[in-house]
């Protein structure tokens, strides 16, 4: 009789611990989901637009470009043949537009 009680107690203990951990995991998951939904509603559209904008994807200055495709360089840059240290390269590069 005593052995049966010990085994029953052990089974109940294991089930209690297992179910308790499952509840904690689901609570963390639901909290994470709520936080992600709140973040998406507050910042999601703005962040997605700003990350995907052409200016944010802009590689910047001294990046190879194709002179026949004006969209290779960002709006602040223009596709020019290199001068000075880069004259031996065959391709064009994005340089800052000259003011004036």
From Swiss-Prot:
Similarity section = Belongs to the neurotoxin 14 (magi-1) family. 08 (Ltx-4) subfamily.
Q: What else is known?
A: Negative results: does not show activity on Nav1.1/SCN1A, Nav1.5/SCN5A, Nav1.7/SCN9A, Cav1.2/CACNA1C, and Cav2.2/CACNA1B.
Q: Where in the cell is it found?
A: Secreted
- From what superkingdom does this record's organism come? Eukaryota
* Entry's free-text remark on domains: The presence of a 'disulfide through disulfide knot' structurally defines this protein as a knottin.
Q: Name one GO cellular component term.
A: extracellular region
Key words of the record: Amidation, Calcium channel impairing toxin, Disulfide bond, Ion channel impairing toxin, Secreted, Signal, Toxin, Voltage-gated calcium channel impairing toxin
Tissue expression, per UniProt? Answer: Expressed by the venom duct.
- Disulfide bridges in this chain: 58-74, 65-79, 73-94
Q: Which organism is it from?
A: Acanthoscurria paulensis (Brazilian giant black tarantula spider)
Propiece residues: 23-57
Q: Which InterPro entries match?
A: Toxin_22
Query: Span of the secretion signal?
Result: 1-22
Q: Where, per the database record, does this protein carry Serine amide?
A: 99
- Its name, as the record gives it, is Omega toxin Ap2
Q: Which GO terms describe its molecular function?
A: calcium channel regulator activity; sodium channel inhibitor activity; toxin activity
Q: What is the lineage of its organism?
A: Eukaryota, Metazoa, Ecdysozoa, Arthropoda, Chelicerata
* Job description of the protein: Inhibits 31.17% of Cav2.1/CACNA1A current at 1 uM concentration.
